[in-house]
Amino acid sequence: MAFTQALVTVLALLAGTLPHRHSENSPPKKANGDKCVHHTQCSSDCCLIDLERSGAFCTPKSRIGMGCLPQTKGSLNIMCPCRSGLNCHSKDPTCPRRCQMI
């Protein structure tokens, strides 16, 4: 009986502390062009550093033929990963990676 009560208490604590993916309290995703500090804030999942505009802004993922990075690491990007259905690839190690259909 004590084990069951302890288990219920632990589950209740975990349920209250774990973030919900689609909670009513979670802020809406930002549109392209909006300022951001982390890629998860953007509806495109890409927060790109823009030195000319002195900040970071949500931007669309890279299209076919555009420069890319294979994945998002950290909170900000210097290049965005590819859109769905494209792969970030380079045929030659000395050439920059580009989004391609493979």
Curated annotation (Swiss-Prot):
Q: Give the location in the cell.
A: Secreted
Name the domain of life this protein comes from.
Answer: Eukaryota
Name one cellular component (GO) term: extracellular region
Q: Which GO terms describe its molecular function?
A: enzyme activator activity
Q: Where is the signal peptide?
A: 1-23
Disulfides per UniProt = C36-C47, C42-C58, C46-C80, C68-C88, C82-C99
Instruction: List keywords of the entry alphabetically.
Output: Disulfide bond, Secreted, Signal
Predominant subcellular localization, coarse grouping? secreted
Q: What PROSITE patterns is this protein classified in?
A: COLIPASE_2 (PS51342)
Q: Does the keyword Disulfide bond apply?
A: yes
Q: Which GO terms describe its biological process?
A: digestion; lipid catabolic process
Q: Which InterPro entries match?
A: Colipase (IPR001981)
Task: Please state which protein family the record places this protein in.
Answer: Belongs to the colipase family.
- From the Swiss-Prot or TrEMBL record, give the protein name: Colipase-like protein 2
To which species is this protein native?
Mus musculus (Mouse)
Protein's gene: Clpsl2
